[in-house]
């Protein structure tokens, strides 16, 4: 039965492992610790009893890239998965463009990703309903994820909390849900991506440290749903390694003889995504402290997203207030609830700039709001501000107003 692939593929813990030469337990989510690099069987994909989703191919390729010891950077999995999927599925209608931009001036490279959903016109996306998760991430759970003498916390109680947040987001009609850094166990990654595709909700969250050998990978995950030919559900998955590990994070990893997997200076990398006509980029906690990195997409953004686990909320509050005005875009941050600072900001008068700000609580929940994208872009395109433009402040000096037309 295993050789024929004629069984319920939903039981397979990691996507497409049943299409490879892997001989271990397919239902074991601990496959991430095997240090194996399985290869997809062309015969099995040719004779597959079901449709293989694009996001399954991406998650599988991300796993393979983490296990490889080649010089190719981890983020190359996104382009590799796209090209391989198109090769294996000649009839694929995946309308995703990924272009790598290397500025060559010492600044980070980035992927410019364009997701073309035939259901919507780029010019008619007037607002976006988002939610931030107010969720407690104990430090004990973070350490359990990478300590060899502990097991990750994948308890029923933790699962119920996350499920409740996802279900509430669906009930509220949320289009984009943001969760904190290191908020999701590695073994739950396939479920999260599948949920994004099936329910057509974008998810941005931090994955717990993924340990390969003696390296601990702090990964920021983005899942952007779309429909091929306007009707078939699909999903684009982005994952990248944190560019700047926090000093305390490094010290904690070193206590357990682990190395941070942060890239070298010439391999710093980000993503600039155009999804449903909205242009955004995501940052992973301490990356925001780098003034050059957070200004990388000046005049390019409708929305900047930050997934953090951070005690110094005052420091980050100043960074975010600066970012929303300097970049002249909405800023969304999700932090662990015991420290607070989770917020949604817009570039307006101080008294109006905080759309959402929350801290505390024992129960996990979400807070929602709608972002006025058309109003923001209208202000971004104006060189001066008139008395009728009270919803937003004037754009900062040096802002490229013409760039708005190219999104």
Stretch-by-stretch model annotation:
Residues 1-121, 128:
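Extended repeat-based interaction scaffolds and adjacent low-complexity, acidic/S/T/P-biased segments
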Residues 84-123, 215-299, 319:
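Active-site catalytic loop in hydrolytic enzyme cores
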Residues 127-151, 239-241, 278-287, 305-307:
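Active-site-proximal beta-strand elements of phosphoester/diester hydrolases
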Residues 156-238, 310-312, 319-321, 325, ...:
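Cys-nucleophile CN-hydrolase/nitrilase-fold catalytic domain and related Cys-dependent amidase chemistry
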Residues 176-181, 280-283, 304-306, 332:
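Short catalytic-loop micro-motif centered on adjacent basic/acidic residues
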Residues 390-407:
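C-terminal functional modules of predominantly eukaryotic multidomain proteins
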């Amino acid at each position: 039965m295993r050789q024929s692939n004629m069984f319920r593929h939903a039981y397979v813990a990691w996507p497409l492992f049943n299409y490879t030469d892997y001989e271990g337990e397919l239902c074991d989510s601990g496959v991430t610790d095997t240090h194996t690099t399985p290869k997809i069987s062309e015969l099995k994909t040719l004779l597959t009893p079901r449709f293989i989703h694009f996001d399954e191919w991406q998650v599988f390729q991300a796993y393979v890239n983490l296990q490889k010891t080649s010089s190719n950077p981890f983020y190359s999995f996104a382009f590799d998965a796209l090209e391989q999927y198109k090769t294996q599925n000649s009839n694929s209608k995946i309308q995703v463009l990924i272009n790598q931009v290397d500025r060559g001036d010492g600044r980070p490279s980035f992927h410019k990703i364009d997701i073309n959903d035939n259901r919507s016109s780029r010019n008619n996306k007037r607002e976006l309903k988002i939610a931030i998760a107010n969720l407690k991430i104990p430090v004990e759970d973070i350490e359990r994820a990478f300590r060899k003498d502990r097991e990750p916390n994948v308890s029923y109680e933790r699962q119920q909390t996350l499920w409740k947040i996802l279900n509430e987001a669906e009930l509220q009609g949320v289009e984009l849900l943001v969760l904190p850094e290191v908020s999701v166990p590695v073994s739950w990654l396939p479920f999260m991506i599948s949920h994004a595709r099936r329910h057509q909700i974008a998810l941005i969250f931090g994955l717990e440290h993924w340990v390969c050998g003696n390296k601990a990978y702090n990964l920021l995950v983005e899942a952007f749903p779309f429909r091929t030919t306007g009707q078939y559900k699909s999903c684009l998955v982005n994952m990248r390694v944190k560019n700047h590990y926090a000093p305390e994070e490094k010290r904690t990893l070193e206590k357990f003889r682990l190395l941070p997997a942060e890239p070298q200076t010439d391999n710093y990398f980000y993503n600039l995504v155009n999804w449903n006509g909205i242009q955004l980029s995501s940052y992973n906690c301490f990356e925001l402290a780098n003034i050059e990195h957070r200004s990388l997409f000046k005049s390019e953004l409708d929305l900047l997203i930050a997934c953090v686990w951070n005690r110094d909320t005052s420091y980050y509050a100043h960074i975010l207030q600066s970012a929303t005005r300097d970049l002249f875009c909405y800023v969304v941050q999700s932090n662990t609830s015991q420290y607070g600072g989770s917020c949604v900001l817009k570039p307006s008068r101080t008294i109006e700039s905080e759309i959402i700000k929350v801290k505390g609580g024992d129960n996990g929940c979400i807070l929602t709001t709608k972002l006025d994208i058309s109003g923001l872009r209208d202000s971004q395109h104006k060189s001066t501000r008139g008395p009728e433009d009270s919803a937003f402040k004037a754009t900062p000096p040096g802002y490229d107003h013409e760039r708005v037309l190219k999104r």
